[in-house]
UniProtKB/Swiss-Prot annotation:
This is Nuclear export protein. A motif (Nuclear export signal) lies at residues 12-21, 85-94. It comes from Influenza A virus (strain A/Tokyo/3/1967 H2N2). Mediates the nuclear export of encapsidated genomic RNAs (ribonucleoproteins, RNPs). Acts as an adapter between viral RNPs complexes and the nuclear export machinery of the cell. Possesses no intrinsic RNA-binding activity, but includes a C-terminal M1-binding domain. This domain is believed to allow recognition of RNPs bound to the protein M1. It is found in: Virion; Host nucleus. SUPFAM superfamilies: Nonstructural protein ns2, Nep, M1-binding domain (SSF101156).
Amino acid sequence: MDSNTVSSFQDILLRMSKMRLGSSSEDLNGMITQFESLKLYRDSLGEAVMRMGDIHSLQNRNSKWREQLGQKFEEIRWLIEEVRHRLKITENSFEQITFMQALQLLFEVEQEIRTFSFQLI
């Protein structure tokens, strides 16, 4: 994985974990958990692409990997909408910057997962 992407994930997760958004802290914790899950999934797809022979083991291990891929794209879309919503309602510039960077990272990760998945198909 690109070292910039790693540091972007780590930076955004750290900053999001420091935010306190009132009664919506559970929602924020859910977003953080989904970001972490998305990062792990992206990493595993990237590793499978790097070892192209693993496509068969990936398919054997999880015969529903295409379905899982679709679910990940749904999660990304949900996160994008949630981050956009947070961006609209927050007035704190630190939070605005964090959510703008999170949104940019989500778009990048979505594109990377699409690229990896096309290579695996």
